[in-house]
UniProtKB/Swiss-Prot annotation:
Organism the protein comes from: Prochlorococcus marinus (strain MIT 9515)
Name of the molecule in the record: ATP-dependent Clp protease adapter protein ClpS
Family the UniProt entry places it in: Belongs to the ClpS family.
Organism taxonomic ancestry: Bacteria, Bacillati, Cyanobacteriota, Cyanophyceae, Synechococcales
Alphabetized Gene3D superfamilies for the sequence: 3.30.1390.10
HAMAP family, per the entry: ClpS
InterPro entries found in the cross-reference section: ClpS (IPR022935), ClpS_core (IPR003769), Ribosomal_bL12_C/ClpS-like (IPR014719)
Transmembrane segments: none
Segment forming the signal sequence: none
Domain of life: Bacteria
Gene that this polypeptide is encoded by: clpS
Pfam families membership: ClpS
Chain's role: Involved in the modulation of the specificity of the ClpAP-mediated ATP-dependent protein degradation.
């Protein structure tokens, strides 16, 4: 919701526009990209694939995510908007790695 306020300037020909936005902006929902435990592919392959698919991950981050999935059954890869989340998950699947997305709460 926006409030627009118009005022006449000194010469009666200029206008000042004041716009106030609501405190709560519409935020797009975020989605979690999840990596599932993979008994088929090697840990090294999964780490490399994570870094190829999500380039902003460091090697240490990729290893930590892979180990989280290995030890707990699922690891959190990244939280982002829906479109990139779908892209990351599908890219991992195309490399034979089990992945899913779910809405972040």
């Amino acid at each position: 919701m926006s409030i627009i306020k118009l005022e006449k300037g000194d010469n009666n020909n200029a206008a000042v526009l004041e716009k106030k936005t609501a405190a709560l902006k519409n935020k797009s929902p975020k989605y979690k990209v999840l990596l599932h435990n993979d008994p088929v592919n090697s840990m090294e392959y999964i780490t490399i694939a994570l870094r190829e698919v999500v380039p902003q991950l460091s090697e240490q981050d990729a290893i930590a995510i892979m180990l989280e999935a290995h030890n707990n059954g699922v690891g959190l890869v990244i939280v982002c908007d829906l479109e990139p989340a779908e892209f990351y998950s599908e890219s991992l699947k195309s490399k034979g790695i089990s992945s899913s997305i779910e809405k972040d709460e």
